[in-house]
Amino acid sequence: MRDWRWMLLVLALLLGWLQYRFWFGPGNSGEVMMLEAQVANQERDNEGLQQRNDALAAEVKDLKEGQSAIEERARSELGMIKPGEKFYRVVEDAPVHPAQPAAGVSAQVGDHPADVP
């Protein structure tokens, strides 16, 4: 009977020690959850960077193999045109704003000379 109590005490102490390490020791559950969140954030960042790399790789391939990408770049970034081609630039008019009264000037009824009878 005495051995049984001794064994129960050892098992309870072992369980207590394991629980302490699980909750407060190195690699505890809070730290594991924090690291899992960091891994998820890093995977999301990596996915975005992979998409950007794929787009850049496709652009490099297009520039190496096709003339249309080079022509498009020359037109849009350098403003180049083909010989004999006419270039038209459409400039939209700036919106007209109504004149605002000067600061400190009050525009009340009766202040204007036309308002006086």
Swiss-Prot record:
Coiled coil location: 29-69
GO cellular component entries: cell division site; cell septum; plasma membrane
Transmembrane segments: 7-24
Quaternary structure (record): Part of a complex composed of FtsB, FtsL and FtsQ.
Keyword vocabulary terms for this entry: Cell cycle, Cell division, Cell inner membrane, Cell membrane, Coiled coil, Membrane, Transmembrane, Transmembrane helix
Biological role stated in the UniProt entry: Essential cell division protein. May link together the upstream cell division proteins, which are predominantly cytoplasmic, with the downstream cell division proteins, which are predominantly periplasmic.
Periplasmic side: 25-117
Main subcellular localisation: membrane
Name the UniProt record assigns to this protein: Cell division protein FtsB
Organism listed in the record: Stenotrophomonas maltophilia (strain K279a)
Any one of the GO BP annotations: FtsZ-dependent cytokinesis
Keyword field contains Ribonucleoprotein: no
NCBIfam families: PRK00888.1
Membrane topology, as annotated: Single-pass type II membrane protein
Similarity field: Belongs to the FtsB family.
Cytoplasmic side: 1-6
Superkingdom of the source species: Bacteria
Subcellular location: Cell inner membrane
